[in-house]
C-alpha cells in the first residue's frame, strides 16, 4: 500500500477539539482523494482505557492516525492538577500508540507542545533540545507525559519498525477552542473575558504583567501543516510547526488585538499579583522552512478577528 495513492482511513483522536476541527475544515476544503477521515470525539471512546481503545480501533480499522487527544488546560489548572495531567495523558498516549502497533497502522503523527522543552535553555529552541533538562515546574505533569510520546515513538521504531512521529506546535488558537475563563489558554480566555467585560460594561482585567512573549499559530494554518506532515514527513524525530521567531508577540499586545477586534472601549488592567508562567518559549521553525520553502501563515490580526467573530456567533454552544 502506498501512502499517498491508496485509499486510507485516517483516524483523528481528539477530533472535536480546536486542532481536530481545523483539520476537518481543511480536509473538507482541499482533500480530493478517496481517503476516509474519522474525527473521534471523547464520547466515542475512552482513550484512558486500553479495552475501549482496542475496540474502537477494531471498529474503525485505521491505516493512519493523527493523535490529538489529551487532557489539556491553562496555566493555573496545570499547576493545581499535576498528578491528573500526568497520569491521564500517559494512559491516553500509551493506549493509542500500543493500538497503532497492534492494528498495523502505517503512520501515526502525535501532537506535542512547546511546554515540553526545558525551562532553562537557550533560545530559539529547536527539535534537538527536548530532553536537555526539566520542563517549567508549572506544567511538569503534562510536559513529562507529552515527552514520553517522543521516547515511545523512537522505541517503537527501533523495536518494531513502526512509523510513529510527532509535531510540536506553538500556542494554538482559533474557532472551536476552549473558552473557559480559568481553564482555557490565553487567547480564548481573553476573548471570553473581553466579551463579558463588554456585556457587563466593565474594565478588562488580565492575569499577570502582560509581558511574556509567545508565538501563536492559527488552527487552520496548523491543520494545513499537520496534514502535510502526515503525507510527507518521513523522520521519527519531532517537527516544530510554528510561525517565525520574528512573529513572537506579548500577551499585552494580543489583548490589544482582541479588544480592537471586538471594539472594546474599556480599560485594560494587568493584575501583577498573578503568575506570568514562562517569560518566553521562542521556537525555531527553520526545519519546517527547509522542508516547506513556501511557508505561509494567516496574519495574526485577521486570525484573531475571525476567532473573536466565531466566539460571538457561537457563544451559546462554545466550550466555556
Curated annotation (Swiss-Prot):
InterPro entries, sorted: Epimerase_deHydtase (IPR001509), GDP_fucose/colitose_synth (IPR028614), NAD(P)-bd_dom_sf (IPR036291)
Site feature location: Lowers pKa of active site Tyr: 146
Pathway(s): Nucleotide-sugar biosynthesis; GDP-L-fucose biosynthesis via de novo pathway; GDP-L-fucose from GDP-alpha-D-mannose: step 2/2
Catalytic activity: GDP-beta-L-fucose + NADP(+) = GDP-4-dehydro-alpha-D-rhamnose + NADPH + H(+)
SUPFAM superfamilies: NAD(P)-binding Rossmann-fold domains
Pfam family, one: Epimerase
Gene Ontology terms, MF aspect: GDP-L-fucose synthase activity; isomerase activity
Membership in a protein family: Belongs to the NAD(P)-dependent epimerase/dehydratase family. Fucose synthase subfamily.
Protein name: GDP-L-fucose synthase
